């Protein structure tokens, strides 16, 4: 299901101390799962930091709820995601407000929760600069073609006298993007002993077949005198459709 992405990581150090953090904090969108939106399976006050892979509501939509419930740490994103996040969260708020009104239910979070959430955002460069979040944890982001601002997240856990633990979170991954050059993951990263946490929503999708089918359907519709209506349900999709239609027009 494309919904509610939120990975809790608990690091247990040899001295008995712990670090708790999450990667993404998404909204459950399907009605069958909406009952899970109101709470977390952890105490938000105990989460030291959050890292965001990309700016889609199923990965960011509950960030204001996290803050509302007591989270006080940093929210690490790429620079592009930091720019787009206010728009995405404002849209999420409006949608949730309408849903709550229709169902005569309590709203998940307020506009002030959204504003407070944005004050926690810390924008990070891709791969040129790692962030030492604390003495034991280093964060590095790498470009991901899923959407502008999307990132592969490398978390390295370090403790003196012990080998590093390297966690790679892919988010929704794509190795290409029509608006941006996506470099291959560096050899220095690929040769690390990695634990990879991978999203697999589109893992069996052949994108070339989808593109060919789209072109064929659009052309057939136009030739028969019809009108093409394209539904674009998330950030990035709409821009890709417009670009594709312009390319077809030029050809």
Labelled PLM ranges:
Residues 1-51, 56-60, 65-240, 246-249:
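His/Asp/Glu-rich metal-coordinating catalytic cores
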């Amino acid at each position: 299901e494309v919904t509610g992405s939120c990975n809790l990581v608990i690091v247990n150090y040899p001295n008995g101390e712990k670090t708790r953090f999450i990667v993404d904090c998404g909204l459950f969108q399907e009605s069958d799962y909406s009952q899970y939106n109101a709470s977390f399976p952890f105490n938000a006050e105990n989460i030291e930091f959050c890292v965001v892979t990309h700016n889609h509501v199923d990965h960011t939509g509950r960030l204001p709820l996290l803050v509302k419930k007591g989270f006080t740490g940093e929210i690490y994103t790429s620079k592009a995601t930091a720019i787009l996040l206010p728009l995405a969260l404002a849209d999420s708020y409006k949608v949730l407000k309408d849903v709550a009104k229709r169902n005569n239910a309590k709203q998940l979070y307020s506009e002030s929760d959204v504003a407070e959430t944005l004050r926690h955002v810390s924008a990070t460069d891709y791969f040129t600069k790692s962030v030492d979040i604390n003495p034991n944890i280093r964060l590095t982001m790498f470009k991901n073609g899923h959407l502008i601002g999307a990132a592969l997240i490398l978390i390295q856990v370090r403790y003196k006298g012990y080998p590093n633990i390297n966690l790679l979170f892919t988010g929704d991954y794509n190795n290409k993007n029509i608006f941006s050059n996506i470099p291959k993951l560096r050899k220095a990263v690929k040769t690390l002993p990695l634990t990879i946490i991978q999203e697999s929503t589109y893992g069996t999708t052949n994108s070339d077949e989808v593109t060919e089918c789209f072109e064929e359907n659009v052309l057939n519709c136009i030739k028969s005198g019809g009108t093409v209506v394209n539904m674009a349900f998330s950030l990035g999709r709409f821009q890709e459709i417009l670009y594709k239609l312009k390319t077809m027009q030029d050809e």
